[in-house]
Amino acid sequence: ALGAEVEIEKVIGIEKLADGTFKVKTEYNEYQAKSVVIAAGVKHKHLRTKSGRDDLVGKGVYYCAICDGAFYKGKEVMVIGDGNTALQYAILLSSYCKKVYVYTLFDKFFGDDSLVKTLRGKDNVEVRPNTSVTDFIGENELTSVEYKDKDGNVCYHEIPAVFVAIGQIPDNKAFLPLVDLDKDGYIISDETCKTKTDGLFVAGDCRTKPVRQVATAVADGAVAATNASIYIESLNN
């Protein structure tokens, strides 16, 4: 309605030209703009296994229960993680899966008490604390998981699907050196969502901030867009 054009492409770099405009490079094209708002979000943190393989992702190993959980209706599944996302995944999966095993590194959850209480009330959920998943096994699809129990014993669990929820990480290297990153890789900005480069703004989970929720991301978008507009107007004066 507002004339925006959407291009589904991966950005591989941003450059500020001598005339003050920005050149945004993607895998296929280059775009020029007077101002840019980075809203790259974050990506799921992948579980490091001893084999280092990622070929089973989408073939039994998943990072989004909302997207892929329904494929395993009536079957047994596993959730790896101990935070809010893992709790939410396990609760969701328990509503249509035969059995949900939750593997956690520690003997407690690091999530909201209300979610923990809800999970504990599910008859088809089994929590296995103090376990460390070390590898995914299978040729063309996942067949089992290798893990170490609290005593360090190597064990195996036959399971058709695993949902990993061990956190999220930013991927902001493409925007260097026009931005500064904190120690965790998030883009540093001020309260106007401006980065260290004039005309370059950032919004959402990819920037340094104390709270990462939909509400704060939407607020960032409004702030960044407003200040990008102000910046463009200043160029015309």
Regions found by a protein language model. Give the residues of each.
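A Rossmann-like FAD-binding core segment of flavoenzymes
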Residues: 1, 5-25, 30-33, 95-190, ...
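Conserved acidic
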Residues: 35, 42
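Redox-cofactor binding/interface segments in oxidoreductases and associated redox assembly factors
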Residues: 38-39, 79, 164-165
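FAD-site-proximal beta/loop scaffold in flavoenzymes
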Residues: 43, 49, 54-71, 166-216, ...
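Residues that mark the start of a beta-strand
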Residues: 60, 75-76, 99
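Glycine-rich Rossmann-fold phosphate-binding loop(s) that bind the pyrophosphate
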Residues: 81-83
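N-terminal Rossmann-fold NAD(P) dinucleotide-binding loop
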Residues: 86
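Generic hydrophobic/aromatic pocket-lining and core-packing "Φ" positions
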Residues: 90-91
